[in-house]
Amino acid sequence: MLVHQGAGAAETTTMKIQIEARGKKWTISLENNETARALYAKLPLTLDMEDLYGRELCYRFREALPAREVEMRGYEIGQVVYWPPRHSFVILYRQNGEAFDMQSVGRVESGIDELAQLGDAKARLTRAE
């Protein structure tokens, strides 16, 4: 979970992204790592998300994001990851048992079943309040 400390040491907030597509909204809680911070710094963004392999929504950035904690592993439904070989921002909505090199970025808080039905879509990503 990515935490931002405000002016007072006791003031902390979890950094979150709101995704809006086809009139629906979802929230992603970010992890505390360099990749999540770099993604958050790019917001707001409008991305053409592709529905790939029957398991994920994906957008490929032109430029790489920093990713120094990449590991080969399996994933959980609702996990949000960065796949370095193709600079891919990925939301995983269905399990197929595959393991691959990934940098974990965060997690969709709720509504992953609705997100799985989205298909290819234009999505607006903003900083959640």
Region locations from a protein language model:
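N-terminal secretory signal peptides
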Residues: 11-60
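Short alpha-helix capping/helix-loop boundary micro-motifs
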Residues: 65-69
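Cleavable N-terminal signal peptides
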Residues: 6-8
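Well-ordered alpha/beta subsegment
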Residues: 18, 106-129
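Loop/turn positions that initiate beta-strands
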Residues: 78-79
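Beta-strand-rich cores of mature extracytoplasmic or soluble domains
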Residues: 84-108
